[in-house]
């Protein structure tokens, strides 16, 4: 039904066109306008073909079309014929008021909106959604007024080939801006610009209702195309994943099979080497710190011992000067002490001397000092320091057996100094180093006499 009404002009021959000499006969006009109702639902310029056929006898169809609209909307609108005659290249603004009056009148009487009525047409559905056609108006056979090519050869269904591609570019863009952006990106579509400007001029009419209806028309295909796009994207992603899985799975499995073996074998070896190396470094650092501490301690002891020996030598000289009879006894004791010092000095290079711990300052015997030293907790060490201890113990026992004089120790020196201080207190002499030294000499002399007397008695 729609196709017959739309292309009715093609079937009417030129000889049967209504003449201009009967303008008053409204009945004939109404009868002739009956098959033109479906084109009235379309936009002006798309369905009527008198703009392409510039024959003189077809001017009455414009008058009849305007009369049919005016008959419904109100009083007839009579203007110049130049406003109703549309040529091939003249797209002036005189068409807009005519289209505005027709559209307003049709909206008052019709029950459905213009885009809904157009949507029911099988031929106009795609054209309203996708206004760009693969072939421009100028290239179509309708653009030539005098051509003998039939208008049936040009079908609007050709525009369906680019429907899916064009829907991706026209989702939420205004109709005027979308044409400019697409034509700027594609220089091949420069021929379609005059036709597209004509369509945008119709769309951007000053009434607000047409803008709302056009936005609704554009929203409907965008919803449909979003579903189609989602389905197509899901299918494409599934195919791509299948291809990538088939191509990459064997490579990944081979890589994992080859890479896992050396990884598990190499990982446990590294921490063992690191731990052993760290333990060795820790032990070396401990040994170095211990050796440094021992060396510093031995130096301090040697310095103190030398000072004591020097002082003791000076005291002995002063005693001999005052009492030359004490020279033999003192020399014998000093030789023994010097021999012990030499033997102990050789061992002190390896182990610190334990000479001071053998007897406390209070005069305790050597065994008690050794017991306390052995009972004290000591860190585990190598068996090297044990050998010199045994040698030293043997040496001391041998010296005790061979010598009859007692060993001079720090305890004995302390006792002599205490006795010398007592002598100075008794005599009320000042505590000067010289007086103290002399008192110590007297104490040593008295003790030596005590030790010599029992030997003479035996």
From Swiss-Prot:
Role summary: Component of the HUSH complex, a multiprotein complex that mediates epigenetic repression. The HUSH complex is recruited to genomic loci rich in H3K9me3 and is probably required to maintain transcriptional silencing by promoting recruitment of SETDB1, a histone methyltransferase that mediates further deposition of H3K9me3. In the HUSH complex, contributes to the maintenance of the complex at chromatin. Acts as a transcriptional corepressor and regulates the cell cycle, probably via the HUSH complex.
Tissue expression from the record: Ubiquitous.
GO cellular component entries: chromosome; cytosol; Golgi apparatus; nucleoplasm
Biased composition (Pro residues): 377-386
The record's account of how the chain is modified after translation: Substrate of transglutaminase (in vitro).
Basic residues bias: start-end ranges: 388-398
Gene: PPHLN1
Region: Disordered, residue numbers: 1-51, 63-284, 345-406
Top-level taxon: Eukaryota
Residue positions where N6-acetyllysine is found in the record: 235, 240
The protein, known as: Periphilin-1
Biased composition, class Basic and acidic residues, residue ranges: 1-18, 63-107, 116-142, 181-194, 217-230, 237-246
Alphabetical list of CDD domains matching this protein: periphilin-like
Record text on subunit structure and interactions: Homodimer. Component of the HUSH complex; at least composed of TASOR, PPHLN1 and MPHOSPH8. Interacts with SIN3A and HDAC1. May interact with PPL.
